[in-house]
């Protein structure tokens, strides 16, 4: 039975939530929970849709036009547990309408103008626990056929036309009834006969709500010896006299909770005399609540004398002329003062008080010390209070305090380290302004503290020992504060038992790698609304028991280059929504991980790309790996192409003149040479070339036409082009005049390198080396290739003597004639016995 109640209680709020989160079309209704819950509200239905599954447990048909409910109208839904028929203009309910609904626990008929309700209308409801018949034109409980509903716990018939409080005899068949709501009916008088059934069959757990009934009279002795769990009388009386008389009529009642007063928007009493409550001396009350009463007249010193022995007293929006009524040492254990017009904080001295709630009293700004030696629970929320030197046992007059709530107040200066308050288990400062929290380890003595909330307290955390001493802490909430350099340091060293940590809205940009190393018991971590740029899984690896991680509303683009499997194994809920994801191939691994972890990620469908622009506001799940494969291929081909072009370009640039030479060889390869030799020399040696080389070769027999740059190069053409086209291509031989100046000239070396290529490409080409002067080997070795050639090949060496000259010119002419085609006239003066060339050593 209890299981059905729990299911109904869970399904009712679930409808509102899930209808927003998981709704899908189930024409014409909305499927809230597949095969379980369906919402058919405001669809202008005249009958129940045929396509609702037989397994449905919760069905909302409110605001339709069903009008007439016939026999076995809902027999197609034997599993139904909650049925809402609010405002369906139902006028007739026949016998056995709900027959077959053996599991139905909640039935709501609110707002139906019922004209005909058959005696067997509710037959078959063997498990019904809650029946709501608000605004159903009910005029008497005698006409309501519910006597057989033995499992009924809650009956709500408020806002009807019931004139009599007489409880029918069938109430003796409702042993489980716990709540009867008769508020806002037409009940004026209550007589002994009306509650006779309660004398015969006590309903000890029954709570009655008679608010907003125009009560004029309660017969004395009506409730004598009756025990009730609760009675609510709010906005019932037109005058203080009527209220006083009716309270006196309650004499003899034993009640757990009595509520008197008015509603905020339903005020009837113009004044309140302290004598009104004198009748309470004849009642046995455990808990008393009085609400929305003001303009007390007379001295209120004895106002609560008849409530001296109650355990719980609650004052809601009560305007007391002075505080004298609260200054006596009553036996109260629980006192609530909510939104009352006090000018200053009450100086209480209640030796038995264990729980004190003093909230929403906006006119009080200063705190007054009080003496409450038994106090364990203190709630001072929303009072605009300021504290200087908070907190110690001297402030509250007790060393037994376990719960302290100072949230939503003004400035609280922590000048003490909670001396004498070592038993504290719950401490809440949220939305108050904390000062001096970084001065020292203010929580050092709170080794029993389980819950700490310093959210939105304008704290900038600098001191790393701020949480020293909190070895038993389970929950820490510190949202809305800031850290030095926007870095979360290692400040949780001693919090080894922490299970819940809230760091949201702390403007965090970085987290120290060891920040969470001590939190081996952590199960819930909220890092939302910060400025984190990446999902660093290594941070959370030590959190072996972590189940819930919220990183939403950050600036996360991707995960760091880590193994995403480092996330704790127990993690079942990860929120990464509202981040700046970069849906690019560079982060392909992370994006694929998002797709693979849809069950772990909350709202994975709502994870949107922030860049690139063509994917902005597109779902992360829409990213395709194939795009990256194509991109990789394109990039690879492009890179290879660029490399090849670059290499070719470099080679062409480096060997440009060699290529020109090659092209020229093909062009001039078969033609006659214009020159016998192209002379390569240093400008420093030009006198020797003109006076010796040119004179002896061009004027000698046979004559040899030489190609000289100063004479034969074409003006306006690049030097390199002249060297190749006029020098090498039109000459049979190349004469290289080697000297110290030659070796030091870059142009000479360049011409020499081209000459080597020319010799390689042309089969008839030849290079004749003339060493003009003795060369130092150290200088010659600077040109490795030239040194190697002179070491391995013959060359001519100039000697300025008669014999040396004769031998030099004879050998040079012979070298120039080698490979030259024979003319018809022959070469009569060609040498026939050339002397061997010398070889350098």
Swiss-Prot record:
Comment text on domains: The TIR domain mediates interaction with NOX4.
Gene that this polypeptide is encoded by: TLR4
Pfam family, one: TIR
Glycosylation positions in this chain: 35, 73, 205, 238, 282, 309, 497, 526, 570, 575, 625
Location(s) in or outside the cell: Cell membrane; Early endosome; Cell projection, Ruffle
Family: Belongs to the Toll-like receptor family.
Protein name: Toll-like receptor 4
Species name: Boselaphus tragocamelus (Nilgai)
Membrane disposition: Single-pass type I membrane protein
Domain of life: Eukaryota
SUPFAM superfamilies (UniProt xref): Outer arm dynein light chain 1 (SSF52075), RNI-like (SSF52047), Toll/Interleukin receptor TIR domain (SSF52200)
């Amino acid at each position: 039975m209890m299981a059905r109640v729990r299911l109904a209680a869970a399904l009712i709020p679930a409808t509102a939530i899930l209808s927003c989160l998981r709704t899908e079309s189930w024409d014409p209704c909305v499927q809230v929970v597949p095969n379980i819950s369906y919402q058919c509200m405001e669809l202008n239905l005249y009958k129940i849709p045929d396509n609702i599954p037989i397994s449905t447990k919760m069905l909302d048909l409110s605001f339709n036009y069903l009008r007439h409910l016939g026999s076995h109208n809902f027999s197609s839904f034997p599993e139904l547990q909650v049925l809402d028929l609010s405002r369906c203009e139902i006028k007739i309910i026949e016998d056995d309408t709900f027959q077959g609904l053996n599991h139905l626990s909640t039935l709501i008929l609110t707002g139906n103008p019922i004209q005909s309700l058959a005696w067997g209308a509710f037959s078959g409801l063997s498990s019904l626990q809650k029946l709501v018949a608000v605004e159903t034109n009910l005029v008497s409980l005698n006409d309501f056929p519910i006597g057989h509903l033995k499992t009924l716990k809650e009956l709500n018939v408020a806002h009807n036309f019931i004139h009599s409080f007489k409880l029918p005899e069938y109430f003796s068949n409702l042993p489980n009834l716990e709540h009867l709501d008769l508020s806002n009916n037409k009940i004026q008088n209550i007589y002994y006969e009306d509650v006779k059934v309660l004398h015969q069959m006590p309903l000890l757990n029954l709570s009655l709500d008679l608010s907003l009934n125009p009560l004029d009279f309660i017969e004395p002795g009506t409730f004598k010896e009756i025990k009730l769990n609760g009675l609510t009388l709010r906005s019932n009386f037109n005058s203080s006299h009527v209220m006083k008389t009716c309270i006196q009529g309650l004499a003899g009642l034993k009640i757990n909770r009595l509520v008197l007063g008015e509603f905020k928007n339903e005020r009837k009493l113009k004044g309140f005399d302290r004598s009104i409550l004198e009748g309470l001396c004849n009642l046995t009350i455990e808990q008393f609540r009085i609400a929305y009463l003001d303009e007390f007249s007379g001295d209120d010193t004895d106002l609560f004398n008849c409530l001296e022995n109650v355990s719980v007293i609650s004052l809601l929006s009560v305007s007391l002329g002075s505080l004298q009524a609260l200054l006596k040492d009553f036996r109260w254990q629980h006192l609530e003062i909510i939104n009352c017009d006090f000018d200053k904080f009450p100086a209480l001295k209640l030796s038995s008080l264990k729980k004190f709630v003093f909230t929403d009293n906006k006119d009080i700004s200063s705190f007054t010390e009080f003496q409450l030696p038994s106090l364990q629970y203190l709630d001072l929320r929303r009072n605009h209070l300021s504290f200087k030197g908070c907190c110690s046992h001297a402030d509250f007059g007790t060393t037994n305090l376990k719960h302290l709530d100072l949230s939503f107040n003004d400035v609280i200066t922590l000048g003490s380290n909670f001396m004498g308050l070592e038993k504290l288990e719950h401490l809440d400062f949220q939305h108050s302004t904390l000062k001096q929290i970084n001065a020292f380890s203010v929580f050092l003595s709170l080794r029993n503290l389980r819950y700490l909330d310093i959210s939105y307290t304008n704290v900038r955390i600098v001191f790393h020992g701020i949480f020293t001493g909190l070895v038993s802490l389970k929950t820490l909430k510190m949202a809305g504060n800031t850290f030095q350099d926007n870095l979360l340091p290692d400040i949780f060293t001693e919090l080894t038992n922490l299970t819940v940590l809230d760091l949201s809205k702390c403007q965090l940009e970085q987290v120290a790698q060891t920040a969470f190393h001590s939190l081996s018991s952590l199960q819930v971590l909220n890092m939302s609304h910060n400025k984190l740029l990446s999902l660093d899984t290594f941070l959370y690896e030590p959190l072996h028991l972590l189940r819930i991680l919220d990183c939403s509303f950050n600036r996360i683009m991707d995960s760091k280059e880590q193994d995403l499997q480092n996330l704790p194994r127990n993690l079942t809920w990860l929120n990464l929504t509202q981040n700046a994801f970069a849906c690019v191939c560079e982060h392909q691994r992370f994006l694929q991980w998002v797709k693979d972890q849809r069950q772990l990620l909350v709202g994975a469908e709502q994870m949107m790309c922030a860049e690139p622009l063509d994917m902005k506001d597109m779902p992360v799940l829409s990213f395709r790996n194939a795009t990256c494969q194509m991109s990789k291929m394109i990039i690879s081909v492009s890179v290879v192409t660029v490399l090849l072009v670059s290499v070719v370009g470099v080679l062409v640039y480096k060997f440009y003149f060699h290529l020109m030479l090659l092209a020229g060889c093909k062009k001039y390869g078969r033609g006659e040479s214009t020159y016998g030799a192209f002379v390569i020399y240093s400008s420093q040696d030009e006198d020797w070339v003109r006076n010796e080389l040119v004179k002896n070769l061009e004027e000698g027999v046979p004559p040899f036409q030489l190609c000289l740059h100063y004479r034969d190069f074409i003006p306006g053409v690049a030097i390199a082009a002249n060297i190749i086209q006029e020098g090498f291509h039109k000459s049979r031989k190349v004469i290289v005049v080697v000297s110290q100046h030659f070796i030091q000239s870059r142009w000479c070396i360049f011409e020499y390198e081209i000459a080597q290529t020319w010799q390689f490409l042309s089969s008839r080409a030849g290079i004749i080396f003339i060493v003009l002067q003795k060369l130092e080997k150290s200088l010659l070795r600077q040109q490795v290739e030239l040194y190697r050639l002179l070491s391995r090949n013959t060359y001519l060496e100039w000697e300025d003597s008669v014999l040396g000259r004769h031998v030099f010119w004879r050998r040079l002419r012979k070298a120039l004639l080698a490979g030259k085609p024979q003319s018809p006239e022959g070469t009569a003066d060609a040498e026939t016995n050339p002397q061997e060339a010398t070889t350098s050593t």
